[in-house]
C-alpha cells in the first residue's frame, strides 16, 4: 500500500467518525426546534430520533457481512447518494413520517461509513499503535461534537431553519466522497486475493461479552447524559447559548483527552488504565449531577477529558481478544455500542417525562458504574496480554 493511499484511507476513517459524531451529538441542540416545527412535545420528538439510531445499529450489524460482498468504495459512493436524498427529504418535506425515514437513512449512511472507518484503522495498524490510531480517529467524533453544536447554536440564534444544520453535516460526506477517487481499498471476502493457507477460526472468549456490555452501557450512559444536559441546564436558569457551551466544552475536552491519551496509552496496560478511567468518569459525572451551576463548567471539562479514551480502548481490547483482528468481532463490539445509541431516547425519554432531566443524568451515572464493574472483571479473563506478547516476538 502506498503512503498517499494510506493517508487517504486514514482521512476517510477520521471523517467517518466526524459524520457520526455530528449526527448523534447535534440532536440535543435541534430537538426543541424540530419539536416546535412539528408541534410536538420535546419528549415525544425524542422518540423519532430512535430512527437515526436504529439506522446506525442495523447498518453496523449488517456491514460485518456486507463488507465481504460489496466493495468498500462502492458502499461509500452509494452512501453519498443516500445522504443527498436524506438531506433533501428533511428540507422539502413537512411530514413526520418522511422526517423519520430521512433520519433512518442518515443513520444507515452513518453506520456503514463508521464501520468501514473502524475496519480500515484495525486493518492498517497493529498492537498498541492500533489503539492510539483508533483513539485519534475517535477524536474526530468529539471534534464534530464540539464544532456542530456551535454551528447549530449560531444558525438557530439567527432564526435559520434547523434543517440547514443537517445540510452542513452533509458537507462532511462530500469530503469522504471526494477522497474515494483515486484510492484503493482493502479487498475482503470473495474480492480478496486467494491464499492456500486455511484461516483458523478463534473462539472469542468471555472477555468479549464483558467488553460488549461495557460498550453498550458506556454509549447509552454518555449519550443519555449529553443529550439532556441542555434541558437540565435550562431548567437551572441557563440560556440556550450557555447550555450549548456546556455541551461544546464537554466535546472539546473529550477531543483534547483523546489526543493526550493516544500518547499516554502506549505506556500502560490497556485493561488497567481502562478500569481507572471508567471509575474516575463515574465519580466526575456524579459531581456534575449533584453540583451547583457554578461548578458545572469545570466538572464537565474534567469528565470529558477522563472519559475520552474509554470507548476506543474497549474496541481496541476487543480486537486484541483474538490473534488476528476479526472484522466480525470489532463490528460486534461496535454494534453493542450502537445498541446503546439506539436506546438513548427509548430509555431516557420516559425517565425525563416522569422525573425530569436530572433523573436521566443520574441513570447515565449508574450506567458508568456498570462500565467500571465490567472493566474490572475483564482483568481476570482478557487475552490481550498474551496476544501482545506473541506479536512483539
From Swiss-Prot:
Main location: membrane
KW Metal-binding (keyword) present: no
Claim: Kinase is one of the keywords in the record: no
Bilayer topology annotation: Multi-pass membrane protein
TM region(s), chain numbering: 11-31, 51-71, 78-98, 101-121, 134-154, 162-182, 206-226, 245-265, 273-293, 297-317, 332-352, 361-381
PANTHER family: L-FUCOSE-PROTON SYMPORTER, PROTEIN TSGA
Protein name in UniProt: Protein TsgA
Amino acid at each position: 500500500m502506498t503512503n498517499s493511499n494510506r493517508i487517504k484511507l486514514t482521512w476517510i476513517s477520521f471523517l467517518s467518525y466526524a459524520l457520526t459524531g455530528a449526527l448523534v451529538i447535534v440532536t440535543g441542540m435541534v430537538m426543541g426546534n424540530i419539536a416546535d416545527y412539528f408541534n410536538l412535545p420535546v419528549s415525544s420528538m425524542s422518540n423519532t430520533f430512535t430512527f437515526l439510531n436504529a439506522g446506525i445499529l442495523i447498518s453496523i450489524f449488517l456491514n460485518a457481512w456486507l463488507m465481504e460482498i460489496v466493495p468498500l468504495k462502492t458502499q461509500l459512493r452509494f452512501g453519498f447518494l443516500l445522504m443527498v436524498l436524506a438531506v433533501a427529504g428533511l428540507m422539502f418535506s413537512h411530514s413526520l413520517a418522511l422526517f423519520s425515514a430521512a433520519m433512518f437513512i442518515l443513520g444507515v449512511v452513518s453506520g456503514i461509513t463508521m464501520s468501514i472507518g473502524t475496519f480500515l484503522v484495525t486493518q492498517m495498524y497493529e498492537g498498541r499503535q492500533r489503539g492510539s490510531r483508533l483513539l485519534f480517529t475517535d477524536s474526530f467524533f468529539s471534534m464534530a461534537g464540539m464544532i456542530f453544536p456551535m454551528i447549530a447554536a449560531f444558525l438557530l440564534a439567527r432564526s435559520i431553519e434547523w434543517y440547514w444544520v443537517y445540510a452542513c453535516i452533509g458537507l462532511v460526506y462530500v469530503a469522504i466522497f471526494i477522497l474515494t477517487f483515486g484510492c484503493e481499498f482493502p479487498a475482503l471476502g470473495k474480492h480478496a486475493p486467494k491464499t492456500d493457507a486455511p484461516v483458523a477460526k478463534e473462539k472469542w472468549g468471555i472477555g468479549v461479552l464483558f467488553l460488549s456490555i461495557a460498550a453498550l452501557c458506556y454509549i447509552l450512559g454518555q449519550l443519555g447524559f449529553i443529550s439532556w444536559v441542555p434541558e437540565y441546564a435550562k431548567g437551572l436558569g441557563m440560556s440556550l447559548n450557555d447550555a450549548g457551551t456546556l455541551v461544546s466544552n464537554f466535546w472539546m475536552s473529550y477531543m483534547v483527552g483523546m489526543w493526550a491519551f493516544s500518547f499516554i496509552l502506549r505506556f500502560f496496560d490497556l485493561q488497567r488504565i481502562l478500569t481507572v478511567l471508567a471509575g474516575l468518569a463515574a465519580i466526575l459525572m456524579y459531581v456534575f449531577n449533584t453540583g451547583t451551576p457554578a461548578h458545572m463548567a469545570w466538572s464537565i471539562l474534567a469528565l470529558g477529558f477522563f472519559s475520552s479514551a474509554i470507548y476506543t480502548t474497549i474496541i481496541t481490547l476487543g480486537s486484541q481478544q483474538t490473534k488476528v483482528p476479526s472484522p466480525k468481532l470489532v463490528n460486534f463490539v461496535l454494534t453493542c455500542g450502537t445498541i446503546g445509541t439506539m436506546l438513548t431516547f427509548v430509555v431516557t425519554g420516559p425517565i425525563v417525562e416522569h422525573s425530569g432531566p436530572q433523573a436521566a443524568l443520574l441513570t447515565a451515572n449508574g450506567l458508568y458504574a456498570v462500565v467500571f464493574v465490567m472493566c474490572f472483571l475483564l482483568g481476570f479473563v482478557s487475552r490481550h496480554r498474551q496476544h501482545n506478547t506473541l506479536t512483539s516476538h
